[in-house]
Design a protein with these regions (language model features):
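Histidine-anchored nucleotide/phosphate-binding helix
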Residues: 89-92, 105-108, 143
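Polyanionic/metal-chelating signatures
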Residues: 1-99
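Catalytic beta/alpha-barrel core
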Residues: 74-80, 98-107, 126, 130-131
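Active-site environment of divalent metal-dependent phosphoester hydrolases
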Residues: 82-86, 106-111, 161-163
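Surface-exposed patches in mature extracellular/periplasmic domains of secreted proteins
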Residues: 46, 100-104, 155-158
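His/Asp/Glu-enriched, well-ordered alpha-helical/loop segment
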Residues: 74, 112-172
Length: 172
């Protein structure tokens, strides 16, 4: 039997469980989380003796994020809005992490920036009707426009319902 460990960490943008809907606050929470992982790595013994400040998440989560912060494991962020994609690229550059982007409904709008950052994207079939405000600019040609700009594009399934699966014909 061949078995491989985890290959990536996945995070969503704008998740209701994040406790915020403000984008600036959301990114502040990501920065605090990554700063906490770095602090935890440097002061693990102090953490275990209760001599550190309270961190943003549990010890198990801090441990799980160490390979991401160290650049050994990619972080897959699910983002749609062009401004959020650019913010994710800035975040990855600031923290020196390997980043993959998923969904990227408005990726075609910032395809040059994604290509310049050498960040691969995972896209699926979509139609011209947005599902939320973050994907108002989505286009059926998103994957083709990203590829034409030099972005590495991975085609993924976008859902299990009949309607979502039916949109496979819309990949261009």
């Amino acid at each position: 039997m061949l078995r491989k460990g985890s290959i990536a960490m996945v995070g969503g943008f704008g998740n209701p469980t994040a406790g915020t809907s403000a984008r600036a606050e959301y990114w502040a929470k990501w920065r605090r989380l990554f700063d906490d992982v770095k602090a935890y790595q440097l002061r693990r013994a102090a953490y275990e003796s209760g001599s550190t400040r309270e961190f943003a998440t549990s010890q198990a989560n801090l441990e799980a994020l160490i390979p991401v912060v160290a650049g050994q494991m990619p972080l897959i962020l699910d983002v749609d809005r062009a401004s959020d994609i650019l913010a994710a690229l800035d975040f990855a550059k600031a923290y020196g992490i390997k980043l993959w982007l998923a969904s990227v409904s408005e990726g075609w709008m910032v395809a040059k920036e994604i290509a310049a950052a050498k960040v691969p994207v995972m896209v699926g079939a979509m139609n011209d009707i947005p599902t939320d405000f973050a994907s108002l600019g989505q286009r059926r040609e998103n994957a083709a426009l990203l590829k034409a700009a030099g972005v590495t594009v991975v085609i993924v399934g976008t859902g299990t319902s009949g309607a979502e699966s039916f949109n496979v014909r819309n990949i261009r």
